[in-house]
């Protein structure tokens, strides 16, 4: 019987975590992920003469299984499996499977590697006969394990992984989904880590694009290479071992920095060693020449300026940075002013705190668009669109996480420049920014603070419900106007004469009867009936679509169509937040429906 994706992933994690022993998660991940990679490429490409990945004879997963229990298993894996596989495919910095300092020595090492191989003999991981659309399962398993390792790795060691939800936001706001992409379309991440951000951008494109990534840590660059292959991007070009700032490895034929259509990045926050190996005042790539030199101990703008320089004249980019870049003074204020004046900054998105592995500080996404900049002759930038998404998240263990509805709302509002809710987002004109001395701190422009409860002293002393408090619920009275009159009536003056006390209302039903009065009121009952009928109509249409597509479908495409349809279905319905309805479907998909669809597909 086929195993569900969720069960497969949790089983993999539980087994791997059990075998880890005292090894640091940041080290153990290399062994687990390499093992998963060997299993995947062996199933998919072994014996294929023209495959994009070469599996040397004697270097497949089956050959690794044959080494189980042998006293020299670690040395043999290095020599017969990992070495030839890495050499044939130019994979860098693979882990040492015969390292006693990490895996133990003697029988301990033999048992640990034997058991680790056994985990990946799971029949559910046999993808040699799977259809193409099923390949996502191993790629997703790789990302699942990386996310858990990032959580376990602690401060600074989890930075190889950008949370998938944040990556999705960045991939969508740069507009690659709407663009006419081809194989010549280029996407670059100068600090690519494990490559998850690059892959999310590639997944949004309508056609296959060409991916480039540089990562200073060679072991992490190796993870990125494997991640590309597992997600069916074997031709992605990943280079490692050098700092992007000191030694950028992607150069054009003219000797200058290679430029790209899209650039995305999640660089190390406030990198204090950004200038190591680099003379910023004499930068051969002229990244700081027209903007200013970043502070010696704050490398945030160094990475952002590298992105600007690496974009084509029509290029678009997005970079995750700490909020300090928006308001810090001195050299950074000069750089910020120059970037704004050139029209490069399209938008700022404030994210919730504690989203990222390795740090709890809040961050923002700085969105770059060269196409509408002054420098390139298209001076159409009238302002900067600012969005405060800091309150939209859910607790997930010891971290915060963006929900599907949070991601969708951010992308919708940003893409449409929707400023109907000024507490969430607004277009800030350049004149206003200039008036604030080019300070981009989001709270200066968006007041996202919760309104304090107004204390009505007269109401406290003399009784009565302030009419303003009742009117604040106008959305409900628009739907049920007579319900308001059923619940409230003008407050009489009492012993102070005939008439009514202006501005105050009286509750006409007992407090314990409020809920039943609302539920039994004909207007509310009618509203509930209409909403139930509205949902039932959508459910019937969705059921017909599911039965029609059951013969051949891709689960991810299916849920995308269904969820987008549901979102539009509730777009204009009163009292119901369409994003809340959307989240209910996405939760159901994640918990139940996704597994069933992958079993059927």
Predicted regions and their residues:
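Non-catalytic, mostly N-terminal accessory regions of nucleic-acid modification and defense proteins
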Residues: 1-178, 239-249, 350-353, 381-388, ...
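Hydrophobic alpha-helical scaffolding
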Residues: 106, 131, 213-217, 262, ...
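Conserved S-adenosyl-L-methionine
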Residues: 156-265, 270-291, 301-302, 321-324, ...
